[in-house]
Every structure is written in C-alpha cells, then in structure tokens.
Regions:
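Active-site neighborhood of HAD-like aspartate-dependent phosphohydrolases
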Residues: 1-49
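Asp-based, Mg2+/Mn2+-dependent phosphohydrolase catalytic module
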Residues: 1-5, 17-18, 33, 41, ...
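A generic alpha-helix surface/boundary motif
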Residues: 22-26, 67-71, 132, 164
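Short, surface-exposed acidic
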Residues: 33-46, 79-92, 146
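A metal-dependent, Asp-based hydrolase signature
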Residues: 49-93
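Surface-exposed cleft-lining segments at the edges of enzyme active sites
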Residues: 95-102
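Short beta-strand/loop segments at the ligand-binding rim of alpha/beta enzyme cores
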Residues: 121-123
Length: 232
C-alpha cells in the first residue's frame, strides 16, 4: 500500500537547469558591468573555472557544499584578483534573488500534490543541495504547508544515490521504503537510488527521453497522475 510520495526537487518540480543558466548569465553581466567593469567573457571564464575547482575539490567526498554558490563566486573573485570579502555575499545574493524570481512550479504539480494529500498520502522531498536554499525554493514554489518532510544532502552528509538519504526521508515520514513512490529526474541518482532502496521509482522526464523500458516514466504531471492512480 502506498503511504507516501517523495519528490526530488530540482528539475522534478520546476525547471532548475535552464533558469540556473539564465541567472548565471545575468549575474556575470552584473559583476562585469556594475561591479568590476571587466569584460563579460573574462568574468564568465573565471566563474566556470571557480565552479569547476569547487566541484573537483569536494565531489570526491559527495558533499552538498559542492553546490554552494558562495564558494563558486568566492573562487571566481579570487581568480579575477578581487577580494571576495568585498563582493562575494553581494554577488551570491544577486544570483539567488535573480534565480528565485525566475522559477515557477511545473504545471499540474500543486494540484497533484493537493490531491494526494486529500487522499491521505504523505508528501516528502529528497534533494541534493544545501538546506537553506532548498527551503527558499520551496517557499517560492508555493510548497510551504504542502510538505510533510524533507531531507537534503547537507543534512544527510551524503548525496544520492546513497541509500542513507532514502532511508532518512522514510524515517521522517514514518513509512516503510516499500510504501513509497519516488519521483525524480536523474536516472542514476533518483531512479536507481530509489529502486535500490526498495521504493517504486517514477522517472520524471523533464530533461531527457526515456531509455529504460523497465522503468515507469512521466513527461508531465498528468501522466504522473495516471501512473500513480494505477499503482495505488
């Protein structure tokens, strides 16, 4: 019996990839033209180099900090020969305010969640990222008050597909793993992670086409509703 539905957040409940790219472009323009009066290409190159350095340094430990934009912008400024103490938080806040003003929840998602809640099904979030910004996204997307629990990789100390994250969210929800439908866009992190944890995975195809015929998949929330209605 299905007692809970757990969602990945980024690119499952809203478009993260494309809005992130736009926010990066806007932030680079802001830094280049308003703060440092440098060429935009130079600033973008420094940002990309700084981001890659952070990921290279931290990804081996599978830490949420590898996603932290304050570190990306710190490295960017250091590469440009500018003191991060002067501008880092200003740039960080500019980026996230720009990003949050762009995002909107996928059509049908709130209605789907409300319907599941009305049927007594608990709703959780299991997401790689730092907790602070995920709470801000949840508020922006209108999910506050609709969720029963969330686990971030920052809280878990490890990232998906490690089973610890999946076990922690079910513990918070008070359900067993085999009582959960898990919805996420990453085949490796979400689909296989949930499957290996004993959940029923649904691959949310926001960024790619289906390649595994043995996996339930949905391209939108109308399709997800049809799948869930058959499973429960």
């Amino acid at each position: 019996m299905v007692k809970a539905i757990v969602f990945d957040l980024d690119d499952t409940l809203y478009d993260c990839l494309h809005e992130n790219d736009k926010a990066v472009d806007d932030t680079v323009r802001y830094v280049a033209n308003e703060l440092l009066h440098m060429d935009e290409v130079t600033v973008m190159k420094a940002f990309e180099e700084g981001r890659d350095l952070v990921k290279d340094q931290l990804s081996a430990w599978d830490m949420a900090a590898q996603h932290n934009r304050v570190l990306y912008f710190q490295k960017m400024l250091e590469i440009l020969g500018v003191s991060p103490f002067r501008y880092d938080l200003q740039v960080y806040n500019y980026f996230w305010n720009n990003f949050l003003n762009r995002i909107s929840i996928f059509p049908g998602a709130l209605e789907f969640i409300d319907d599941m809640k009305a049927r007594g099904i608990k709703i959780g979030i299991c997401t790689d990222m730092t907790a602070h910004i995920q709470f801000r996204k949840i508020d922006r997307l209108g999910l506050t008050g609709r969720l029963d629990a969330m686990i971030t990789s920052e809280e878990a100390g490890i990232e998906k597909p490690n089973r610890r994250m999946f076990d922690m969210i079910t513990a918070k929800l008070g359900v067993k793993n085999d009582e959960v439908i898990y919805v996420g866009d990453s085949y490796k992190k979400d689909v296989m992670g949930a499957k290996n944890a004993g959940m029923t995975p649904v691959w949310y195809l926001s960024l790619q086409n289906k390649t595994d015929e043995d996996v339930l998949a949905a391209r939108n929330y109308a399709e997800l509703r049809n799948i869930v209605n058959k499973v429960i």
